[in-house]
Amino acid sequence: MGEALDDSDQTERLLAGLPSVYAAALRIANGFTVHSGMNRVFGVREDRHMDLRSWNEVEGWRFAWGEKADPSFLMFGETAFGDQYALRWTGSSYEDVVYLLDVNLLSVRPIFNSFAYFLDQEIVQNAISPSHPTALACVEKFGRVPFNENVVLTPSLLLGGYEDVSNMVKIDSYAAMIYGGDIYTAVVSAPDEAAVVGVEPWVDDIGRPRLRVVFAD
């Protein structure tokens, strides 16, 4: 559990737009993780890695995904792999349907028809009896995954990697999401026949870690 939820007007306005079950959960546990950090729900926190507001700022990581990071979605949590749990803004409040945005493509699909069902089937279930084989393998390899880190595949699936825990490493969660956006943008904009020869890390002008995908000439 995180620090106590503050009672500022700004926080109250934020909670007022959320599904009532999520708002109630934040009043009890202001951001939390289960299954050794493999599943996270953000709160209103000092640390930007678990802060609902910071995580959704465009300049944090969403910028790297461009239009794929649909601003109508509030990313309220994630798996340690970077798949995003999200709520959709309907114009006056957030719809009480939980969506999942895939870490590799940010493709969207509804996964639970209410936040209450999400808590029961995704969070409580993973807290009590986790069963996702890759998540279990990650916990066996890494132990607890800190909430400020994600587990990433090297190379990415989009660069020809394959999903095996032996090819996974832990890095800062913001960096992981930025790298994912950089890879996605490079791959979808490259000619179909372009061959990837490597990646080059770099830092942008405000200090954010970036990744450049290098294609064969």
Residue spans of the language-model regions?
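Short aromatic loop motif centered on NTY/YTY
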Residues: 123-157
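Compact, glycine/acidic-enriched structural inserts
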Residues: 96-134
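A surface-exposed partner-binding patch
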Residues: 1-92, 147-217
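Charge-rich, low-complexity amphipathic helices
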Residues: 40, 44-52, 98, 120, ...
